Amino acid sequence: KEKKLLGTGGALHSLKKKKVKDFILLNGDTIFDINLNDLIKSKKKNTIGSIALIKNNSNKDNKKLNNLKISDNILSYSKNASLMNGGIYYFKKDIFKYIQNKNISLENEILPELINKKIICGKKFNEFFFDIGTPKNFLKADKLLYKHFFKPAAFLDRDGVINFDKGYVHNKKDFKFRPGVVKGLKFLSKNKYYIFIVTNQAGIGKKIFSLNSFIKLHLHIKQILQKENIFIDNVSYSPFHPDAIIKKYKKNSSTRKPGNLMIEKIKKEWHLNLSKSFMIGDQNSDKICAKKSGLYFEFANKNFFSQAKSIIKRNQ
């Protein structure tokens, strides 16, 4: 907590004490639905970082950093340039050389210095952008943000749908994507679907593998999919089973399919277009779970991409 106002720049000074290295900074009054990996990759060697930019067309009354252009990833000013600051930044720790413990503006003082020295990069994005920094936009926020994030969802079982089910899959060696999965997940993302994994993982409760092993495997899956610009929005798992060895997991739970508590929790936390949402599974318990939550259901077929494409066509 600041003892005195330090501005958008001076407030960052407190991070210096925490020995921060690379970091992402987001303005609190903007929504910019971008791929952060693309922003990170846009930074060139021997620069401080990179700024996410948006075309300044419907934001004429916006007073944020503007009149910007990009040349070979390096950011500069130009009188008639159409790009403006989108409020998301990737910085190296070297940024702290330019941040003092005083009231100072990031956009009006620090960033202009970096731009003039040609040591800051920029990356243009065309994704959804909304700034509540003006009274007019603030009044529009609820309706526009709800509309943007109101999307259908694909609820997917994991073993037997995402990967081949070899029984209690919990390491990289045994994990293998089923045919069409990567292409199908990319297709779902392109068509603005949330992607949720809902999986029974009794192996955790039975001590066949650890929770840490489960998490490590999903980090591995995440790394593979990120290279394809695919992002799983949520992974829900149920470690419960009546025959579990670990006491806290030895019980019946509505999170375990055919119970539908995993799905119901997701429904409460996300703005979902349920009429176009669906579930793919490989067990009758998946089908029962989907029915309880009012979701269209199909058993996994031979090719995930073909199946996902067919379901989306059906929903149009």
Task: Give each language-model segment a name.
Residues 23-24, 31, 37-44, 56-60, ...:
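Catalytic-core segments of class I nucleotidyltransferases/pyrophosphorylases
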Residues 1-66:
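Conserved beta-loop-beta/alpha segment of the NTase-like Rossmann-fold superfamily
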Residues 15, 29, 68, 92, ...:
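Residue-level signal for inorganic ion chemistry
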Residues 26-30, 201, 282-283:
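Active-site metal-binding loops of divalent metal-dependent hydrolases
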Residues 212-215, 219-233, 243-279, 283-316:
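Asp-based, Mg2+/Mn2+-dependent phosphohydrolase catalytic module
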Residues 5-6, 30-33, 129, 161, ...:
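A short, conserved beta-strand element in the Rossmann-like catalytic core
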Residues 181, 185-221, 231-244, 290:
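Substrate-recognition element of Asp-dependent hydrolases with the DxDx(T/V) motif
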Residues 152-194:
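Active-site neighborhood of HAD-like aspartate-dependent phosphohydrolases
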